[in-house]
Amino acid sequence: MDTELLKTFLEVSRTRHFGRAAESLYLTQSAVSFRIRQLENQLGVNLFTRHRNNIRLTAAGEKLLPYAETLMSTWQAARKEVAHTSRHNEFSIGASASLWECMLNQWLGRLYQNQDVHTGLQFEARIAQRQSLVKQLHERQLDLLITTEAPKMDEFCSQLLGYFTLALYTSAPSKLKGDLNYLRLEWGPDFQQHEAGLIGADEVPILTTSSAELAQQQIAMLNGCTWLPVSWARKKGGLHTVVDSTTLSRPLYAIWLQNSDKNALIRDLLKINVLDEVY
């Protein structure tokens, strides 16, 4: 039996709501419904009664519940033991491309320079979208996530690492927003909520990317502007702030599993400044 089906069953039984279960599992609601139907077809019984938003376990669902919990607990323990033997010296860090390019690349270098912390460790620098990395963290496929937005889930620990400043940059001096095309560099879902007010509600990005390097290289060719970290942009050179723009402060968080067996190691690694300028 597919353990993902049991995992979905347990989440729906816990939340009694397909939408909330989908949110917790980082799936669409239709995917959750499909998994429940698959499990019901395999068992030949209905597991839930559905009356509008009132979802309850059937008698068969109630009987399955303790077995599903035991099976998932055993499976998680097995995965943990196998993973521990195969990757006890490995440590994976996940973040978006722009965070790696603008600040985490330098931090990784500092980790390697600090012999006391990294002795024997094999680091993996993983690049992906935040939602994918949160899922990997939840499933113990990732050790540490660096992000601009802390997930609101009880099983995660979080540490505020500091703040960095974003400014709107272009390739030539004395430019106004109205004269430039907008390139959207992804800085997290909460940043996008502010974008309309910062750029203009009717501004359609000419390019969307998660890479700061790519965005920086394209702004001259596209007569564009994009939000970049101030400290990084100054080091790159050849960039100018847009005259009629503002700056924005963004938080940076470290996220890891509360019951991670690498808790002590994570806290040691985070003693080495992630940001060049912390305030």
From Swiss-Prot:
InterPro entries named in the record: LTTR, LysR_subst-bd, Tscrpt_reg_HTH_HdfR, Tscrpt_reg_HTH_LysR, WH-like_DNA-bd_sf, WH_DNA-bd_sf
Function (record text): Negatively regulates the transcription of the flagellar master operon flhDC by binding to the upstream region of the operon.
Keyword Transcription regulation: yes
The organism's place on the tree of life at top rank: Bacteria
Gene (UniProt): hdfR
Lineage of origin: Bacteria, Pseudomonadati, Pseudomonadota, Gammaproteobacteria, Enterobacterales
Protein name in the entry: HTH-type transcriptional regulator HdfR
DNA-binding region extent: 18-37
Alphabetized PROSITE patterns for the sequence: HTH_LYSR
A Pfam family assignment: HTH_1
Domain HTH lysR-type, first and last residues per copy: 1-58
Gene Ontology BP terms: negative regulation of DNA-templated transcription
Source species: Escherichia coli O45:K1 (strain S88 / ExPEC)
GO MF annotation list: DNA binding; DNA-binding transcription factor activity
Keywords: DNA-binding, Repressor, Transcription, Transcription regulation
Database matches in HAMAP family: HTH_type_HdfR (MF_01233)
Family membership noted in the UniProt record: Belongs to the LysR transcriptional regulatory family.
